[in-house]
Regions:
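Structural and coupling elements of P-loop NTPases
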Residues: 1-317
């Protein structure tokens, strides 16, 4: 097996309880990287999606966000950080597991006052089961009722408890590695982050999100693939477009996927059929756009598969 890395790519899930500030944080990440216009915001773009679809005929609001990072920790490269939206509680168990299957690391975002809530426990357990590295992000450090050190300790206790529970169930689980968790302190509203713990109720001692980007690039591994392996892509979610019909959201694990390509579609019942990719869409900020091809680690949407469903795979046709 010839292992290779997509060093220009990171796939990460941000796990957070509702109202802990995930949308505001992702908004700030997009703005600071210039991933979309300076005056646009996540919620504004989301509300505009129907108008955008009508205007462009192909733009669909993505289920993931693609941040284009060219900052000082990119070492002269342009790095795409795909942020996958993962439901924050157990009611969406299957969707949580599928979302985590698309990523190589997790940012656990907790409110500096409320701390980790019970709903977070389920998602975090699934992430640890999958041996995904975790970054702890304590958000809203400037809340008047912030209790930063206590919340940090609560999050570490939660991680330790979950990891200890999993030791007997998950083979080769490296508990020490899982618990070696970097901590970032942030205010998504202020667009500020630091590795230094601020005083309760204070902003981080840094005026941008570079420490968060650095933590993601350092601790979330680049997608690994076998450059001699044929196409291998897995459908993890579905979407629809008034113009393209059913869309399959998938991650490419090996090989290359191309618009217009005819591939082997492996159905849930084990049968195979050949089908043609009529459209391939990548994500930029919050919008999907047409692309010609996708490689290992890429998360894309494809059209042309009318009855495709979650869990099915695409591979090369065997002649």
């Amino acid at each position: 097996m010839a292992h290779a890395l997509r060093s220009d790519l990171r796939n990460v899930a941000i796990v957070a309880h509702v109202d802990h500030g995930k949308t505001t944080l992702v908004d700030a990440m997009l703005r600071q990287t210039g991933s979309f216009g300076e005056h646009a915001h996540v919620d504004e773009r989301a509300m505009d999606s129907n108008d955008l679809e009508r205007e462009k005929g192909i733009t669909i609001l993505a289920k993931n966000t693609a941040i284009t990072y060219k900052g000082k920790h990119a070492q002269g490269k342009e790095i795409t950080i795909n942020v996958i939206d993962t439901p924050g509680h157990a009611d969406f168990g299957g969707e949580v597991e599928r979302g985590l299957s698309m990523v190589d690391g997790v940012v656990l975002l907790v409110d500096a006052s409320e701390g980790p809530l019970p709903q977070t426990r389920f998602v975090l357990r699934k992430a640890l089961e999958a041996k995904l590295p975790v970054i702890l992000l304590v958000n809203k450090t400037d809340r008047p009722d912030a209790r930063i050190a206590e919340v940090e300790e609560e999050a570490h206790d939660l991680l330790l408890g979950l990891a200890s529970d999993l030791v007997d169930d998950v083979p080769d689980l490296d508990v020490d590695a899982l618990l070696d968790v970097p901590v970032v302190y942030a205010s998504g509203r202020a667009g500020a982050a630091s590795r230094n713990r601020p005083a309760d109720g204070s902003l981080p001692d840094n005026d941008d999100l570079e420490p968060l980007f650095e933590a993601i690039l350092e601790h979330v591994p680049a997608p690994e693939y076998d450059d001699e392996h044929p196409l291998q892509a897995w459908v993890t979610n579905l979407d629809s477009s008034p113009f393209l019909g059913r869309l399959a959201l998938l991650r490419v694990f090996n090989g290359t996927l191309k618009k217009g390509q005819t591939v082997a579609w492996v159905r849930a019942d084990g049968t195979h059929q050949n089908a043609r990719i009529t459209e391939l869409l990548k994500t930029r900020a919050l919008e999907r756009y047409p692309a010609e091809s996708a490689g290992p680690g890429d998360i894309v949407a494809i059209a042309g598969f009318e009855n495709i469903t979650i869990g099915e795979t695409l591979s090369l046709i065997h002649i």
